[in-house]
């Protein structure tokens, strides 16, 4: 994000991001599997067929998000400082660490600021409620989240690493924070 963009972890911004992801998910050419809204940036884990599809899809997503977030904040102009940063996930361990980072980065920063969050509480500014890989969360709650959301902001993973491969290194726990 550009300097001067207001703090993004607000309910209105989260709803806008989820709405954009829900509407755009079938049109982007990429599949957003996990996301989180941070204070001044967004995290996504996506599946794409190739680099050109990834570039086109994320460019389209950035445009849609910028228009929607700017509209919500009552501002105009460029929102994102630069293009996205990407990394191809290559191993089950790296994939598990990345999922943990994206879904649990908000609570990690809250803890660093001295904020108290309930044990095992999910980050409401992420796609954690749609995540099926928690060892300590009832799978029926996840299925209920999928069924009760007409246009979910994320897609179910299709590639082996994001769907099952990462589980070889152990399911996540809701209170498991990213490494410092």
Model regions and ranges:
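Active-site-flanking beta-strand signature of metal-NTP-handling nucleotidyl enzymes
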Residues: 1
